[in-house]
Amino acid sequence: MPKIMKKVYLLIVLISLSAFSQKTFDNIKSEKLGEERRITIGLPDSYEANPNKKYPVLYLMDGDYLFDPFSGAAKYGNYWDDLPEMIIIGIHQNKDGERYEDTTIDQNAGLQFEKGAEFFEFIGAELIPYIEKKYRTAPFRIIAGHDTTASFINFYLYKEQPLFKAYICLSPELAPKMEVRIPEQIAKIKEPL
């Protein structure tokens, strides 16, 4: 192989490694779910260089297929100074149809139910504390979902003190009574989202 080709090849390899070096995977053993759950973690490009900086966190449902598009959009927004750098946590939910079990609701009550209630608690009681202990996080949390998970994230608005400051709902399939409950609950929240 000519010398120039070796240099080009090495450059491509190094660029590829740096592009993917900030994306890692982890498994969290959940007592609430009674299983391990895989997550993808995306750290901002400046994370290692700025050891005193804290970052907002985006918790992403359907992280196994939404992680890369959201990561790309966040980097693009940051490049143009429209979005701050952020940590992205993608929650995997599509291995064995978990996304439907994770978002189980009682159709009569319109509330999370069975595994849906357990998954709701997993995020608030296990995942968020785990991430906040392991990484430098700012007190600004965002949650995003698509379809059934987009509807599910709105249940966090039902809490007296919502866990998240921002919600990104892509094509939500709203649970029964949700279109009435959300405006009522938002009116009760004293601290701006």
Please describe what each predicted stretch is:
Residues Q22-L193:
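Non-catalytic cap/lid and distal C-terminal segments of serine-dependent acyl enzymes
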Residues K7-L17:
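Sec-dependent N-terminal signal peptides
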Residues M1-M5:
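N-terminal secretory signal peptides that target proteins for export/translocation
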